[in-house]
Amino acid sequence: MAKHSTQEVPATGPLYASHNTTRSPTQAPLGPEEGQERKRRRLEAVGPGPQQQQQQQHQQQQQQQTPTHTPSTQACARTGGPVDSNRTRDCDSTSQNPYRHPSDPDCAPVIHLRGDPNSLKCFRYRLQNGKKGLYCKASSTWRWSCEPENQSAFVTIWYTSVTQRAEFLANVKIPPGMQAILGHMSVF
């Protein structure tokens, strides 16, 4: 029978006393002393971890994305420019997406605000509490992964139309120290 102590032990989280003395599959020995077959059975009993689930989902998505071209879905226009010279666009202009760019039905007008992360968060909070009708949605603070951590952060603001974006810029003062970068972004 296992002994239980009533002595206080400093801990960062809650402690739970367990009266069950049987070993579960996750308490099995690990490492070189555990055979391959036993390890396989233990892992099967526990199920796939988050990383394995992510890999399985990625493989399934790749299998589903095999391109198929029929006469009705073939692209009819090519964009100009060195980066997009091989990118095609679908001619289907019947998209139900309300966020439209004249040349791409799946794009929305945006502003990328660039600046100090804390200032961006405060500005976004002020927008949510007073200017909600002047934009559609705002992102959380984000950064480019290839830049050093001490660089500026971004908040992206989406609009339903170029007119709404212009109205936003006419009525909202962008704080000093923030840069507003206008553009279009695919809607996801």
Curated annotation (Swiss-Prot):
User: What keywords appear on the UniProt entry?
Assistant: Host nucleus
| Native source species | Human papillomavirus 29
Spell out the GO cellular component terms annotated for this protein, sorted alphabetically and separated by semicolons. host cell nucleus
The family this protein is said to belong to: Belongs to the papillomaviridae E8^E2C protein family.
Q: State the residue spans of region: Disordered.
A: 1-105
List, alphabetically, the Gene3D superfamilies matched. Answer: 3.30.70.330
Please state where this protein is localized: Host nucleus
Major location (coarse): host cell
**Quick check: keyword Lipid biosynthesis in the entry?**
no
Could you give a GO molecular-function term held by this entry? DNA-binding transcription factor activity
Q: Compositional bias of type Polar residues: which residue ranges?
A: 18-27, 66-76
Biological process annotations from GO: regulation of DNA replication
Annotated S-S bridges: none
Biased composition annotated in UniProt, kind: Low complexity: 51-65
Instruction: Name any one Pfam family assigned in the record.
Output: PPV_E2_C
Function of the protein: Plays a role in limiting the replication of viral DNA in keratinocytes. Recruits the host NCoR/SMRT complex to viral replication foci to mediate repression of both viral replication and transcription.
- Listed name of the protein: Protein E8^E2C
